[in-house]
Amino acid sequence: MTPAQSQARAQLSDGRYVYCVVDTTSVPSASVGETTGIDDETVRVVSVDGVGAVVHDCTSVYDADDIDQVKRWLVTHQQVVDDVSDVFGTPLPMRFDTVFAGGDSALTDWLADTHPRLRTELDGFAGCWEYRVTLLWDPQPFEAHVTATDDTLQALEARQAEADAGTTFLLEKQYDARLAERRRARRSALASDLSAAVEPVATQVASQDTTTSLRDESVSERHTPIARLAVLAPETDESALGSQLDDIAARDGVTIRFTGPWPPYTFAPDICTDEPNQA
């Protein structure tokens, strides 16, 4: 983006910041509770034929060099989406900093133009929520078991006791490689088992990056996330989804983190891509 484009984006005389799209068929459009938006802005709903955009009025986009400020805005954005979910049911979350120029008239035009798709998406997600499942693994119990039962590892260990220094070094490398191979296989099996466990209950499943750390003092530092899934499922199946995880959670060294329900952040389509009214 050029400096001129950046300046044009930053200057809005009548912008609408959009948090999400909701089904207003059975709920009055003004019923957003006491929720306040980014920078304590008043949140309201602009609705067309039972499809509403949850918005606040703005005169600029939300762009800052201060990453902590951006994070605070993002947290508030998500909080608004979570709050209105309690009122309207499953929403279609919008990307952070989705701003339409042109006031309510431009926004209602967009809602009318995209109404068939929005209606279809809202109906498709109705009653379904996103759950997040993380499998954390402490390999020590597995390593203790495999070193005592793996024939190859035991043979390599026995040979080390009788070998000279040079040969011992090579045998140790072979031992470590074999143990790493068994460890990788176990990680892969656990990840596959997790996917298989949630599949019968899930409407959709998406794998997520495991590098984001989970801060939980109740989990040993030896535990590392080896699989993280976003699961879209009906809220009525929440208990069934949790039950599907019980067998895996009972395995040695395994801890399961199961959170939700959340709005379908992972699964909602990016409806506003290349929209002409978007700032």
UniProtKB/Swiss-Prot annotation:
GO cellular component: gas vesicle
Keyword Cytoplasm: no
Protein name from the UniProt record: Gas vesicle protein L2
Family in the record: Belongs to the gas vesicle GvpF/GvpL family.
NCBIfam families named among the record's database cross-references: gas_vesic_GvpL (NF045778)
Ribonucleoprotein as UniProt keyword: no
Coiled coil: none
UniProt keyword list: Gas vesicle, Plasmid
Note: Encoded in a 14-gene locus called c-vac which produces cylindrical gas vesicles only in the stationary growth phase.
Domain of life of the native organism: Archaea
InterPro entries xrefs: Gas_vesic_GvpL, GvpL/GvpF
Function summary: Proteins GvpF to GvpM might be involved in nucleating gas vesicle formation. A minor component of the gas vesicle. Gas vesicles are hollow, gas filled proteinaceous nanostructures found in several microbial planktonic microorganisms. They allow positioning of halobacteria at the optimal depth for growth in the poorly aerated, shallow brine pools of their habitat. Expression of 2 c-vac DNA fragments containing 2 divergently transcribed regions (gvpE-gvpF-gvpG-gvpH-gvpI-gvpJ-gvpK-gvpL-gvpM and gvpA-gvpC-gvpN-gvpO) allows H.volcanii to produce gas vesicles.
Pfam families given in the database record: GvpL_GvpF
Subunit composition and interactions: GvpF to GvpM interact with each other in vitro, and may form multi-subunit complex(es). Interacts with GvpC, GvpN and GvpO.
Subcellular location: Gas vesicle
Induction record: In PHH4 (a deletion of the p-vac locus) transcribed in all growth phases, maximal expression in mid-stationary phase. An unstable 6kb transcript able to cover gvpD-gvpE-gvpF-gvpG-gvpH-gvpI-gvpJ-gvpK-gvpL-gvpM is detected, as well as smaller transcripts. Gas vesicles appear earlier when grown in static culture, possibly due to O(2)-limitation.
GO BP terms, alphabetized: gas vesicle organization
